[in-house]
Amino acid sequence: MFSIFKKKIVVPHIRLSGIIGNVGKFKQGIDFSSQQEIIKKAFSLKKIKSVAISINSPGGSPVQSHLIYSYIRSLAKKKKIKVLVFAEDVAASGGYLIACAGDEIYANSSSIIGSIGVIYASFGFQDMIKKIGIQRRVYTAGKNKSTLDPFVEEKEEDIKRLKNIQLDLHKDFINVVEKSRGTKLNTKSGIDLFTGEFWSGSKAKSLGLIDGLGNADEVLKEKFGENVVIKKFEKQKSWIAKKLSSGQTNQLERLLSKFEEKEIWQKYGL
């Protein structure tokens, strides 16, 4: 005897949004410790064959990006679950590294994808403190402890040391992309994919950085039918955190955080 009720397919849907790094109590963003339990719960649903992950991030900490990427891949491998990733406005730098945890990656035609590189930025204030008559005093144990001090002239050996670290991080990033995308990468395009450049979703598809165009809702319905049940998993602020973050004592911290986030998002016109 056949049941007249068709069994519905359930797909857990995780959403990761914001700058990647140390989130803290009052900052919006993504880090491993704040997302680990959510990711674990999504992969723990019974009788699922796929997990969907939407990501909207311009990047941030390479370590936190790699921790999240590795955790998703380890759960997917252990539980034999397919991971479908959906880029929203932007999946760039560390955001794209996390996206590489997907067996398939989708994006909007206007999404910003890529930025496979490493950046370090700072300021030099050595002339300013001379003009205003400030004398800087620094005492260290270890000759390289004050590397890249913004209040003294840059040293050639410091820059060389920094660039060597950047090269190591860049190689790690490239290895993740090549492992994830494999033969999907368009190596005949004549475009170097690993210069830090970023592209629209449409161009990223032709370069093999993503698999297709579309949002989570339409792609999941296309794959699993109109009756697919999309169960959302997303970090929620606790009641007490909401109350605390609205207090005046945290206004300066939140304002500085907003300026920092705005600067990173603006790189991609957002």
Q: What is each model feature region?
A:
Residues M1-N108, I119-L270:
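N-terminal organellar transit peptides
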